UniProtKB/Swiss-Prot annotation:
Highest taxon in the source lineage: Bacteria
Residues engaged in binding [2Fe-2S] cluster: 90, 121, 181, 256
Residue sites binding [4Fe-4S] cluster per the record: 46, 50, 53
Organism encoding this protein: Francisella tularensis subsp. holarctica (strain LVS)
Family: Belongs to the radical SAM superfamily. Biotin synthase family.
Domain Radical SAM core per the UniProt entry, residue ranges: 28-258
UniProt keyword list: 2Fe-2S, 4Fe-4S, Biotin biosynthesis, Iron, Iron-sulfur, Metal-binding, S-adenosyl-L-methionine, Transferase
Subunit structure, as described in the record: Homodimer.
Cited SUPFAM superfamilies: Radical SAM enzymes (SSF102114)
Cofactor mode of binding and number, as noted: Binds 1 [4Fe-4S] cluster. The cluster is coordinated with 3 cysteines and an exchangeable S-adenosyl-L-methionine. Binds 1 [2Fe-2S] cluster. The cluster is coordinated with 3 cysteines and 1 arginine.
Protein name: Biotin synthase
Job of this protein: Catalyzes the conversion of dethiobiotin (DTB) to biotin by the insertion of a sulfur atom into dethiobiotin via a radical-based mechanism.
InterPro entries: Aldolase_TIM (IPR013785), BATS_dom (IPR010722), Biotin_synth/BioAB (IPR002684), Biotin_synthase (IPR024177), Elp3/MiaA/NifB-like_rSAM (IPR006638), rSAM (IPR007197)
Gene: bioB
Pfam families, per the entry: BATS (PF06968), Radical_SAM (PF04055)
Length: 313
C-alpha cells in the first residue's frame, strides 16, 4: 500500500466510501461491538511533554494526581467493569518507562484481572524486550502504545520521546506475542497528509495492530493544545472518512472510537459505527476526562441494534 493509494481510498465519494467500509466490516465482524473499560492506575506527574496531555508534569492542569493505586482498588474496578458488560479492562499509567519498583506489582495486577475472566490491556510507556516477555507471562493480552500522529508532525507534539522509540516498544510487544493496540489522535492541527502518513505508519508496524484507538483531541486548559484550541480541529465528515479508510486498510482490526466521543452527537457516532467502528470505551470516565455516559451508550446501542461481544459469548 502506498501513500497515493491511501489518498485515493480516502477521497472516494463519501457514500461509496462508507458502503465499502461497511461491507468489509460486516464480512469480518457482523453486528457486534466490543465494550472496554479504562482505568488510570497512576495519574499525573509524567515526565513527557505531549502537548495534548493533562497528565504531563510540564503543564499546570487541574487533574488529581496519584501514585500507583493499590491492587484491591484496581480489582474492585475491574469487577465492576465486568459486571457492567465490559470484555476488556485497560489500565493506563502516566510513566515514560515503568519504574522497576512498580513492575512486579503491575504484573501481579494483570494476572489477577485476567483471573476475573477479563481480557487485559495496559499502557505503561516504553518497555524493553525483557519487560514485554514478563508482561506476557503475567497474562497480558494487549499493550497500547499509540503513534499519536505522523512521523513528520510528531516533533510538533512531543519532544521527550522519539518516534522511533515508539516503534521499538511496539516491536518488543509484538516479539513477545502480545497483541498490539496502536492508533492516534486527530484534530491536533495536523494536515490531511499527516493523517494519511499516520495510516501508512500503522500499516508498516512490526506487527499489524489488532486494536486501533481513534481519538479526537480533547482540549484541556493548561496544556499547549488546550490553550490553543477550544475544540478538536476535525469535523464529523473528516472523522468518518478517516474511520472508513482505516476500516478498509485494516479489515480485521477492532477500531475503537476513544477520546472525544463525549463531544460527538449520537448521529455522528452512528456514522462512525457505519464507517467501521466496533469498539468503544464503556464507562463515565476516560483516564482523567469525561466519557460518553453509560446511559447514553446503552440508549444508542439499543437504537442501532448493536450487541456487545460480551452478550454474544
Amino acid at each position: 500500500m502506498t501513500l497515493q493509494q491511501i489518498k485515493e481510498i480516502y477521497l472516494r465519494p463519501l457514500t461509496e466510501l462508507i458502503l465499502k467500509a461497511l461491507e468489509i466490516h460486516n464480512k469480518n465482524f457482523g453486528n457486534d461491538i466490543e465494550l472496554c473499560s479504562l482505568k488510570s492506575i497512576k495519574t499525573g506527574t509524567c515526565p513527557e511533554d505531549c502537548k495534548y496531555c493533562p497528565q504531563s508534569g510540564h503543564y499546570n492542569t487541574s487533574i488529581e494526581k496519584h501514585k500507583l493505586l493499590d491492587k484491591d482498588s484496581i480489582l474492585a474496578e475491574a469487577k465492576n467493569a465486568k459486571d457492567a458488560g465490559s470484555k476488556r479492562f485497560c489500565m493506563g499509567a502516566a510513566w515514560k518507562h515503568i519504574p522497576k519498583k512498580d513492575f512486579d506489582q503491575v504484573a501481579e495486577i494483570i494476572t489477577e484481572v485476567k483471573n476475573l475472566g477479563l481480557e487485559t490491556c495496559v499502557t505503561l510507556g516504553s518497555i524493553n524486550a525483557d519487560e514485554a516477555t514478563k508482561l506476557k507471562q503475567a497474562g497480558l493480552d494487549y499493550y497500547n502504545h499509540n503513534l499519536d500522529t505522523s512521523r513528520e508532525f510528531y516533533p510538533e507534539i512531543i519532544t521527550t520521546r522519539k518516534f522511533e522509540e515508539r516503534i521499538e516498544t511496539i516491536r518488543n510487544v509484538a516479539n513477545a506475542n502480545i497483541n498490539v493496540c496502536c492508533g492516534g489522535i486527530l484534530g491536533m492541527g495536523e494536515s490531511l497528509d499527516d493523517r494519511f502518513n499516520l495510516l501508512l505508519e500503522l500499516l508498516q508496524l512490526p506487527a499489524a495492530p489488532k486494536s486501533i484507538p481513534i481519538n479526537t483531541l480533547i482540549p484541556v486548559k493548561g496544556t499547549p493544545l488546550g490553550d490553543k484550541y477550544t475544540n478538536a480541529q476535525i469535523d464529523s465528515f473528516e472523522l468518518v472518512r478517516f474511520i472508513a479508510t482505516t476500516r478498509i486498510l485494516f479489515p480485521q482490526a477492532r477500531l475503537r472510537l476513544s477520546a472525544g466521543r463525549e463531544n460527538m452527537s449520537l448521529e455522528t457516532q452512528t456514522l462512525c459505527f457505519l464507517a467501521g467502528i466496533n469498539s468503544i470505551f464503556y464507562g463515565n470516565k476516560l483516564l482523567t476526562e469525561n466519557n460518553a455516559t453509560v446511559n447514553s451508550d446503552n440508549f444508542l446501542l439499543a437504537k442501532l441494534g448493536l450487541k456487545s461481544n460480551a452478550e454474544l459469548c
